[in-house]
């Protein structure tokens, strides 16, 4: 739905059944990736780190892409993340305004790459949530909550009323600023 670079997937997996544990615990994660292969890879990365289950002795049960319920209404999204920089690991909370969560996550990845030089593999999204307007913390998202917001027109190009009056060269330079 939309031309997003990152898609949200729900990945379900577990360790392979053994004689000791015939019904291993099933784990479900919501992850972002460019495609299903990247989402599976990220799932096994976290399983290896958190639960000591590797892909070689694990089993993938299901993978589904998650789509937005209302992709035309604008919402505030809060993203809790952990990232690895040159000096260590850091926790962070970010807020974005977008129509879909995928759009907000893409904004987050772009901002982290530009401001902190942190690329996709070094970022771990801990949690995401739709934040109501009264609970927003960041000024950059709060500024759009004003119902009487105005965007001033600071640059106007005066166009000729007809094609006949259009000229290549002007006698005087036009003043474009108001």
Swiss-Prot record:
Q: Which is a Gene Ontology cellular component entry for this protein? A: cytosolic large ribosomal subunit
A Gene Ontology molecular-function term?
A: structural constituent of ribosome
User: Has the keyword ATP-binding been applied to this entry?
Assistant: no
Which key words are in the record? Ribonucleoprotein, Ribosomal protein
Q: Name one GO biological process term.
A: translation
| Pfam families tied to this protein | Ribosomal_L18A (PF01775)
- Output the superkingdom of the source species: Eukaryota
Q: Which InterPro entries match?
A: Ribosomal_eL20, Ribosomal_eL20_dom, Ribosomal_eL20_eukaryotes
What positions belong to coiled-coil segments? none
What is the similarity comment for this entry?
Belongs to the eukaryotic ribosomal protein eL20 family.
Please state what the protein is called.
Answer: Large ribosomal subunit protein eL20x
Q: To which species is this protein native?
A: Arabidopsis thaliana
Gene name per UniProt: RPL18AC
């Amino acid at each position: 739905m939309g031309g997003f670079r990152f898609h949200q997937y729900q990945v379900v997996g577990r360790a392979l059944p053994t004689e000791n544990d015939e019904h291993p615990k099933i784990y479900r994660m919501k992850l972002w990736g460019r495609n299903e292969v990247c989402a599976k890879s990220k799932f096994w990365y976290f399983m290896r780190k958190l639960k000591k289950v590797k892909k070689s002795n694990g089993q993938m049960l299901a993978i589904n892409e998650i789509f937005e319920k209302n992709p035309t209404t604008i919402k505030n999204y809060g993203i809790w993340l952990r990232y690895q920089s040159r000096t260590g690991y850091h926790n962070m909370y970010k807020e974005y305004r977008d129509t879909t969560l995928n759009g907000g996550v893409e904004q987050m990845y772009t901002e982290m790459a530009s401001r902190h030089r942190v690329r996709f593999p070094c970022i771990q999204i801990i949690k995401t949530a739709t934040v109501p307007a009264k609970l927003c913390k960041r000024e950059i998202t709060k500024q759009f909550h004003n119902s009487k917001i105005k965007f001033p027109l600071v640059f106007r190009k005066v166009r000729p009323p007809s094609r006949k009056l259009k000229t290549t060269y002007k006698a005087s330079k036009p003043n474009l600023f108001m």
